UniProtKB/Swiss-Prot annotation:
Taxonomic placement: Bacteria, Bacillati, Bacillota, Clostridia, Peptostreptococcales
NCBIfam families recorded: transcriptional regulator NrdR
Database matches in Pfam families: ATP-cone, Zn_ribbon_NrdR
Transmembrane segments: none
Signal peptide location: none
Domain of life: Bacteria
Coiled coil: none
Function in brief: Negatively regulates transcription of bacterial ribonucleotide reductase nrd genes and operons by binding to NrdR-boxes.
UniProt protein name: Transcriptional repressor NrdR
Protein's organism: Alkaliphilus metalliredigens (strain QYMF)
Amino acid sequence: MNCPFCSHFESKVVDSRPTDEGQAIRRRRECVSCHKRFTTYEKIEEIPLIVVKKSGNRESFNRNKVLNGMIRACEKRPVPLNKIEAIVDHIEKQLYNSMEKEITTEFIGTLVIDQIKQLDEVAYVRFASVYREFKDINTFMDELKKLLKEKPEEA
């Protein structure tokens, strides 16, 4: 880091401490040439995730939309909110770890549907009916038949 006073390229760190609830590090530096001190902040670069909608429109990823969709699907079901939030955290982590700058709504929906299926079957059918845009009762029944076929026999 160049010194802001003399532009020398070398400095030494005199003090480091976390700030902003651990999201950044504040460093006191001293220039090895002019011996003046200055402060720098180091924080993780956040890459914004862009969601590509079915219409082709693009918008920033909003985890609350995923959370609200799952809460709506789980309404009046015995699913604790902390489980839903943990799934949304997991999905968000998967999206950021994908290293893609643009994510389709279809990809997000697939991640949600895979997770919600393991959580609650009724919530899964509710979410799938919206996500897969069931047009009529036959489409709905086909999805139920698939779900029943996948379900292991109970003794």
